[in-house]
Amino acid sequence: MEPNLKYTDEWLALAKHGNFQLAEKLYFDKLFPEIIENFQSKYSNLFNEDEVLISMLGFSPEPIILTANTIKPIKHYVITTDHKEEVINRVEEFVENEFNLKTISDTSFNTIYKSLKEILYEVESSKITIDITGGKKSMVAVAAIFGKDYRCKITYVDFEGYIKELRKPEPGTEILHVVYNPNINQ
């Protein structure tokens, strides 16, 4: 596990005492930028310079932000089922590169697969990473199947430490797993 980051104790104290708005402000103003920096330095060597990223978006923007800022994709697509304004705003605030938001009408296999295929034809690249961390389980399942079918790298942001009472990862313990790499896994 990572050493305690600079603002972790202060953030924890605020959150555990019910000061959730102040805790969230501290987290995104001070703590999260340090998390991003550490995550980038650990995992940026896993990706090519001309990578395309497709992210599944649920209610937590942090994993998308971590992966996007680590990969630094030439094109980035974020797929979601709803426009969650505050979540989208966080992604816009922290993601260094521009991204294309693609809202799908439902989570059926055909809708998700077709949306991914449209992106594939649009980018005309063979270096595609699909981040399956966010999104509904049905989206993640279809994205994983699609990634295997079209030889896309598949990533997942996990964590080593978890704060049960806050239902959040311990800051600084985030891990990037390459779940599937078509050049290695067959």
Predicted regions and their residues:
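Long, low-complexity, Lys/Arg-enriched
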Residues: M1-K127, S138-Q186
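Short glycine-rich phosphate-binding loop at a beta-alpha junction
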Residues: K127-T133
